[in-house]
């Protein structure tokens, strides 16, 4: 029992990122400068109010393009001013005020349709609305603070825009190479194990970052400051990341195919090669950011020479054993792909060097620019309309926020608890669109608030000087903002300390009551959030994950159909259509990974369902990469006739994918896989007859024969077919375990999949 509880609450000790010292320093300056100005003018309270208003507005600054940040911060500023003005009318009529509160909180939650920026703008406006309702006064102190603070927040966020206009774009592209470099080093450290968790996380992160960088680059074309030539270079570098990743997939698959004893030296050399590639990619990331770091491929060249020597040794040791021939072809393929990879790296390095002087950039990459221009951004009103239905988790989130806000406001009104608006403030920061995220945020907030109240109950007895308390508060909020993405509990500890220090500076309520009120309001707000997230319009995480899995299998069926004509030797691959389906499959894989994270984080998920869900996610992504490897290899095929059993194999794969999808849709045990093992055996026997002929040809020093051409075309294909069969077996077993005790009654409908 205790072990299960520890597993459920393990997220409380887990960090989520790195400490953002830049944000902490910005927060400190944003609070300290107005406070010092207020002291100089004899009105430190106004200075503190301006600093607080600026930090409230800056909550909406989630990074990204300067233009997006400008729009987000300006929208939060205007929205906060309107919300604060509306908040002042709430006490005039309590019934009307309750209705207005519900409407404001619904709008706050529904703004999440615009992503993280929209969600934070909603939180800022709701916060301002609650402050307006709580601090109704005849003077204009709050509005003056908000007006000056909004302008100050814009200066803090984007003052560097004219000096480094393309820095967000550079950072986005540099992150691609940094993630790729870390992935390569992780693979080398894990001896190319496909099950290494760190490597798997980096693959998902790279896929997400590539998608985000493309979207960001598209958005940057809308008449923003900066040189368009530089954006063209950055687009080319994104394309190069894709090409490098494609080569690396092939290398990784080949290394995993042939785990032969006679290739131990080759494996050691490949580990060194992956480490060297990782260093080059990390240097490329620094180079994109404008730092003087020239990647060096000399070590890679030496490792390729060592592999070429191993190829000669394998050829000299060739006997009648098929494993010896497999060793030779493995080393040959590794050398060829490494050489292609080095050529691609050299082109990438040359492109990165042009970032120092974008005027030298020619129009040779107009095709890449065309890809960018074909992408269209949706109208701003489209997310509002497309999510306005009860199947949308974001609409349900808005309704939960509205109901929770009205319940919290009612409790605060009836109990007259001091600072009762903290109930609703807790709700807007804790309640998330899905239960698992709400539970994690709630637990972290309770822990941080409890520790903050405990420590401050002692500290406020020891420190009474208002000026010293002000500086301690500024330091506390700066630490809280810096730690917000690192660990939420620790950040809440400092934010709680800051809030209690503010109340101690202006003790309209005794400090002891403020401490108790903070804790009680947090508990009430958390209880409301937990109750709503668990029971009101809640979508099962099991259902969400199953829908994402069905979508992934549907895309894999379409993806496999793209390579069938080339696999059967009938026609070449339609690259444009294959790329389109591949992009849809990548999006489906990302959605499935997100659904998996939520499923694993949901405390109501049975532990026996977690392992098969994790296995399904990993192996469906691996199956997709296998299809991609086949397409990449078949694109360069010389047109040899395939093994006759390949046609039966393709039919069996199609049938397997269809059966697995049907099983998930109807939450039933999957039908048995077709007898692919027999088909694979027939393919191998046919293939080995060519290998035997080729061994004889090599001994007779015959090159460039039809036999060699066939083997060049189908060595990797046959091995990949074996891997596809094994992965389908694993997926079949995982789905059988996942559907063993179904919790869904009526099957899955894709049209209800969350957007």
Swiss-Prot record:
<feature type="transmembrane region" description="Helical">
    <location>
        <begin position="482"/>
        <end position="502"/>
    </location>
</feature>
<keyword id="KW-1133">Transmembrane helix</keyword>
<keyword id="KW-0472">Membrane</keyword>
<feature type="transmembrane region" description="Helical">
    <location>
        <begin position="70"/>
        <end position="90"/>
    </location>
</feature>
<dbReference type="InterPro" id="IPR032692">
    <property type="entry name" value="YccS_N"/>
</dbReference>
<dbReference type="InterPro" id="IPR049453">
    <property type="entry name" value="Memb_transporter_dom"/>
</dbReference>
<dbReference type="GO" id="GO:0005886">
    <property type="term" value="C:plasma membrane"/>
</dbReference>
<dbReference type="Pfam" id="PF12805">
    <property type="entry name" value="FUSC-like"/>
</dbReference>
<dbReference type="Pfam" id="PF13515">
    <property type="entry name" value="FUSC_2"/>
</dbReference>
<feature type="transmembrane region" description="Helical">
    <location>
        <begin position="446"/>
        <end position="466"/>
    </location>
</feature>
<keyword id="KW-1003">Cell membrane</keyword>
<feature type="transmembrane region" description="Helical">
    <location>
        <begin position="143"/>
        <end position="163"/>
    </location>
</feature>
<keyword id="KW-0812">Transmembrane</keyword>
<feature type="transmembrane region" description="Helical">
    <location>
        <begin position="46"/>
        <end position="66"/>
    </location>
</feature>
<feature type="transmembrane region" description="Helical">
    <location>
        <begin position="93"/>
        <end position="113"/>
    </location>
</feature>
<comment type="similarity">
    <text>Belongs to the YccS/YhfK family.</text>
</comment>
<protein>
    <recommendedName>
        <fullName>Uncharacterized protein slr1298</fullName>
    </recommendedName>
</protein>
<feature type="transmembrane region" description="Helical">
    <location>
        <begin position="411"/>
        <end position="431"/>
    </location>
</feature>
<feature type="transmembrane region" description="Helical">
    <location>
        <begin position="514"/>
        <end position="534"/>
    </location>
</feature>
<dbReference type="InterPro" id="IPR052430">
    <property type="entry name" value="IVT-Associated"/>
</dbReference>
<feature type="transmembrane region" description="Helical">
    <location>
        <begin position="118"/>
        <end position="138"/>
    </location>
</feature>
């Amino acid at each position: 029992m205790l072990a299960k509880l520890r597993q459920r609450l393990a997220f409380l000790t887990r960090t989520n990122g790195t400490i953002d010292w830049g944000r902490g320093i910005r927060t400190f300056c944003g609070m300290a400068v107005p406070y010092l100005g207020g002291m100089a003018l004899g009105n430190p309270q106004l200075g503190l109010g301006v600093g607080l208003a600026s930090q409230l507005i800056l909550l909406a600054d989630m990074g990204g393009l300067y233009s997006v940040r400008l729009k987000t911060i300006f929208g939060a500023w205007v929205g906060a001013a309107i919300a604060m003005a509306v908040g002042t009318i709430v006490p005039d009529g309590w019934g009307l005020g309750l209705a207005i509160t519900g409407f404001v909180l619904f709008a706050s939650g529904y703004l999440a349709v615009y992503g993280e920026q929209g969600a934070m703008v909603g939180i800022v406006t709701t916060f301002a609305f609650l402050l307006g309702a709580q601090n109704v006064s005849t003077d204009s102190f709050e509005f003056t603070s908000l007006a000056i603070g909004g302008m100050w927040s814009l200066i803090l966020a984007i003052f560097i825009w004219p000096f480094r206009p393309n820095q967000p774009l550079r950072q986005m592209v540099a992150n691609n190479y940094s993630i790729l470099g870390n992935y390569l080093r992780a693979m080398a450290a894990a001896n190319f194990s496909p099950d290494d968790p760190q490597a798997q996380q980096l693959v998902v992160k790279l896929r997400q970052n590539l998608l985000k960088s493309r979207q960001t680059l598209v958005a940057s074309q809308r008449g923003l400051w900066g040189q368009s030539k530089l954006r063209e270079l950055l687009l080319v570098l994104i394309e190069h990341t894709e090409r490098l990743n494609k080569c690396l997939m092939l290398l990784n698959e080949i290394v995993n195919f042939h785990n032969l004893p006679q290739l131990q030296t080759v494996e050691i050399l490949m580990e060194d090669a992956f480490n060297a590639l990782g260093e080059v990619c990390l240097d490329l990331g620094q180079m994109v950011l404008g730092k003087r770091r020239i990647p060096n491929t000399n070590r890679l060249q030496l490792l390729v020479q060592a592999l070429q020597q191993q190829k000669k040794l394998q050829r000299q040791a060739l006997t009648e054993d098929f494993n010896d021939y497999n060793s030779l072809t493995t080393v040959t393929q590794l050398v060829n792909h490494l050489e292609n990879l080095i050529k691609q790296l050299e082109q990438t390095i040359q492109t990165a060097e042009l970032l120092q002087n974008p005027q030298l950039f020619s129009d040779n990459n107009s095709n890449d620019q065309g890809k960018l221009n074909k992408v269209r951004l949706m109208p701003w009103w489209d997310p509002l309309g497309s999510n306005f239905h009860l199947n949308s988790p974001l609409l349900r989130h808005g309704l939960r926020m509205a109901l929770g806000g009205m319940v919290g406001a009612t409790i605060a009104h009836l109990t007259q608890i001091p600072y009762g608006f903290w109930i609703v403030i807790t709700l807007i920061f804790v309640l998330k669109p899905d239960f698992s995220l709400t539970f994690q945020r709630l637990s972290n907030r309770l822990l941080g608030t409890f520790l903050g109240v405990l420590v401050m109950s002692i500290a406020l007895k020891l420190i009474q000087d208002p000026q010293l308390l002000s500086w301690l508060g500024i330091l506390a909020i700066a630490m809280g903002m810096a730690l917000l993405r690192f660990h939420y509990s620790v950040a809440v500890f400092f934010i709680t300390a800051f809030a209690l220090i503010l109340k101690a500076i202006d003790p309209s309520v005794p400090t002891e009551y403020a401490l108790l009120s903070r804790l009680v309001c947090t508990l009430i707000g958390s209880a409301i959030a937990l109750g709503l997230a668990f029971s009101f319009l809640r979508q099962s995480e099991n259902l969400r994950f199953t829908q994402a899995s069905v979508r992934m299998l549907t895309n894999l069926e379409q993806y496999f159909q793209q390579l069938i004509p080339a696999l059967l030797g009938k026609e070449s691959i339609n690259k444009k259509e294959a790329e389109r389906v591949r992009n849809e499959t990548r999006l489906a894989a990302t959605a499935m990974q997100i659904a998996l994270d939520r499923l694993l984080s949901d405390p109501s998920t049975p532990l026996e369902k977690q392992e098969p869900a994790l296995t399904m996610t990993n192996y469906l992504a691996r199956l997709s990469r296998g299809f991609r490897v086949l397409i990449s290899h078949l694109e360069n095929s010389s047109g040899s006739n395939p093994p006759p059993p390949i046609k039966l194999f393709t039919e069996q794969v199609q049938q397997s994918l269809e059966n697995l999808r049907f099983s998930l849709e109807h939450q039933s045990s999957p039908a048995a896989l077709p007898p692919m093992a027999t088909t694979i055996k027939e393919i191998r026997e046919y293939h080995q007859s060519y290998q035997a002929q080729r061994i004889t040809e090599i001994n007779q020093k015959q090159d460039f024969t039809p036999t060699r051409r066939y083997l060049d075309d189908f060595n990797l294909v046959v091995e990949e077919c074996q891997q596809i069969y094994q992965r389908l077996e694993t997926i079949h077993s995982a789905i059988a375990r996942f559907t063993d005790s179904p919790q869904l009654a009526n099957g899955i409908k894709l049209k209800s999949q969350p957007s």
